[in-house]
Amino acid sequence: MKTIGLLGGMSWESTIPYYRLINEGIKQRLGGLHSAQVLLHSVDFHEIEECQRRGEWDKTGDILAEAALGLQRAGAEGIVLCTNTMHKVADAIESRCTLPFLHIADATGRAITGAGMTRVALLGTRYTMEQDFYRGRLTEQFSINCLIPEADERAKINQIIFEELCLGQFTEASRAYCAQVIARLAEQGAQGVIFGCTEIGLLVPEERSVLPVFDTAAIHAEDAVAFMLS
């Protein structure tokens, strides 16, 4: 079994499922008392979020690249960045850390393609929904077209993520709002929905979505397990 290095804490609420899902995956594959060989570097999300708001992406890239190097020195054999949004600086991490980097959009793209879909809704932070680092990769590498919410909906979802979910607050009102947005995007032709923020899967259960759900945290964790046992 390879040792996986997790870059977490963005937010820590969604890092917990990564640890659980990876361990469950190893147990299912190997049985008995087997558990995952995991190293975790959990950053202070306050600093990361401030950099996001200020547009200081180079600084966040430096922080995460240094964290990845620390995991490499500690014995990690691959890197999993436990957040969708911070894949905006994936290149900065990969340019300085020589370990295999398991990109969350690639794992998600393979899952969508495997389900025979080419047109999906995307919910996430405004950075993930509006910028090209995530949607563009899905389009270029997997020919997947992402439908995103309207501007006011994007602002509301971003507010829910940062002011509620990242603080461990999960309300029925926000759950219903996200389900309503998903239903509207289904009417526009979306075949499935990407929970492109690792916290959204903590808010909206699959049964509340009219579309098949691609929970990126779960998909990414499965990809990590496959890598660890390869």
From Swiss-Prot:
NCBIfam families: asp_race, PRK10200.1. It catalyses: an L-alpha-amino acid = a D-alpha-amino acid; L-homoserine = D-homoserine. Amino-acid racemase able to utilize a broad range of substrates. Highest activity is observed with L-homoserine and D-homoserine. Has tenfold lower activity against L-methionine, L-leucine, L-valine and L-histidine. Has low activity with L-norvaline, L-asparagine, D-methionine, L-aminobutyric acid, L-isoleucine, L-serine, L-norleucine, L-alanine, L-glutamine, LL-diaminopimelic acid and L-phenylalanine. Has no activity against ten L-amino acids (Thr, Glu, Asp, Arg, Lys, Tyr, Trp, Orn, Cit and Aad). This is Broad specificity amino-acid racemase YgeA. Belongs to the aspartate/glutamate racemases family. The keyword Iron-sulfur does not apply. PROSITE patterns: ASP_GLU_RACEMASE_1 (PS00923), ASP_GLU_RACEMASE_2 (PS00924). One of its GO terms (molecular function) is amino-acid racemase activity. Optimum pH is 8.5 with L-homoserine as substrate. Its EC number is 5.1.1.10. InterPro entries: Asp/Glu/hydantoin_racemase (IPR015942), Asp/Glu_race (IPR001920), Asp/Glu_racemase_AS_1 (IPR018187), Asp/Glu_racemase_AS_2 (IPR033134), Asp_race (IPR004380). Keywords: Isomerase. It comes from the Bacteria. The active site is at T83, C197. Optimum temperature is 37 degrees Celsius. Substrate binds at M10, Q52, T83, N84, T85, T198, E199.
